[in-house]
């Protein structure tokens, strides 16, 4: 549609996150369902800092989602790259991370274009 190239618009997207495995991840999942992303991210950070392997990978993945919601795409990519380094090669988690990376890069590109378009209205 041509109008989408002229005016900014909202597009609803679906994102996945991990919410099991330990108490902090389960509690963070509750916070997400309550739309309390700050509290969820604090718990994910704690899991990320004190765990290794799959738990750390899942927390990094979730932190990437948090930073995407905050429009901090550079930080989101950092955490997603970290999650990818911890995921088993060829695992379903690695595939999910790869798919999310493509989505994140596309969203970052659209966001930069929107920022460029909106600069026209700055004094």
Indicate where each model-derived feature is located.
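C-terminal/domain-edge helix-coil "capping" segments
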Residues: 1-59, 63-71, 82, 86-90, ...
């Amino acid at each position: 549609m041509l109008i989408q190239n002229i005016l900014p618009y909202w597009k609803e997207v679906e994102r996945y996150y991990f919410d099991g495995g330990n108490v902090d991840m389960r509690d963070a999942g509750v916070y997400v369902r309550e739309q309390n992303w700050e509290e969820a991210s604090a718990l994910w950070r704690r899991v990320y800092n004190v765990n290794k392997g799959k738990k750390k990978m899942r927390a990094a993945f979730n932190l990437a989602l948090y930073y995407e919601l905050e429009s901090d795409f550079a930080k989101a990519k950092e955490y997603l790259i970290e999650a990818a380094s911890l995921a088993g090669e060829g695992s379903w988690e690695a595939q999910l991370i790869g798919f999310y990376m493509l989505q994140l890069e596309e969203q970052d590109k659209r966001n930069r274009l929107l920022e460029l378009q909106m600069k026209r209205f700055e004094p």
